[in-house]
Amino acid sequence: MKILLANPRGFCAGVDRAISIVERALELYQPPIYVRHEVVHNRFVVEGLKQRGAIFVEELHEVPDNNIVIFSAHGVSQAVRQEAKQRDLTVFDATCPLVTKVHMEVARASRRNMEVVLIGHAGHPEVEGTMGQYSSETGGMYLVETPADVEKLKAIVKDPSDLHYVSQTTLSVDETADVIEELRRVFPDIQGPRKDDICYATQNRQDAVRELAGDVDVMVVVGSKNSSNSTRLKELAEKLGTPGYLTDCPEDIKPEWFEGKTKVGVTAGASAPEELVNQILERIKELVGARSVDEVLGREENMFFEVPKELQIKQVD
């Protein structure tokens, strides 16, 4: 049995930054440090931070007065920011800068009273945060997930000549392209971002799966089930005809995944740490009797996002 390891894989710059913000806050200010929503969608990472004193909550009212709260990498609405300000909470913002870019596009359109279409998955925290940047009372903001949803907008959009679209950053590149194509067919005057909103890490990891899927009999994606970008990697492998499995726990891997197979592909979503990838690899090697892992060459990534200045320098009492 041969095991092929995709590149690039695992942590992106936004996830790295978000985790560093929580770690630095714990180091500088001591526990408890409150985090609104899972800072990144990975059970392994979240459990590790909990053990160090981070407390994860879903709403700000769960954060006691006079405490520190960190906003997750997925971003938050303007209403959440306003609530934190009114309560005078100390806030560190771990929103991914690439998500912030989308927020700025929506806010700009809102100020101009343009209507906005967001391509994304309902209920995802990034979508909730992005929708929450829109405040125009005369315009409107609408969520679509599939090309079929676009047709329904014809009865809702007020001014098709002044319409803008943005997208969730962790979607399937192919699926987003299909929705954009349908938007442009139904609304020929629609405007979009100068550069695709799908983030570089999402694109790169999906490209790596495309390269690898044809060379393996099964694909194991390291990531949690609530991770959008990890789920898209599994779905992409399956779309390309390769059975895919999503896991964030070595014990969940089943021997039958590999029955009758000769080549296993392994990759990891942008919120999955290399430590977990290695644990998964060891489990697969144990199950299939492989001695080594062949790492596939891929696109080099050198993106880096700084943590807030307040967390960069050790503070002296």
Swiss-Prot record:
Annotated EC: 1.17.7.4
Sites where the protein binds [4Fe-4S] cluster: 12, 96, 199
GO biological process, one term: dimethylallyl diphosphate biosynthetic process
Cofactor(s) essential for the protein: [4Fe-4S] cluster
Pfam families per UniProt: LYTB
Presence of the UniProt keyword ATP-binding in the record: no
Active-site residues, Swiss-Prot/TrEMBL: 126 (proton donor)
Binding annotation for dimethylallyl diphosphate: 41, 74, 124, 227-229, 271
Protein name as catalogued: 4-hydroxy-3-methylbut-2-enyl diphosphate reductase
Organism listed in the record: Vibrio parahaemolyticus serotype O3:K6 (strain RIMD 2210633)
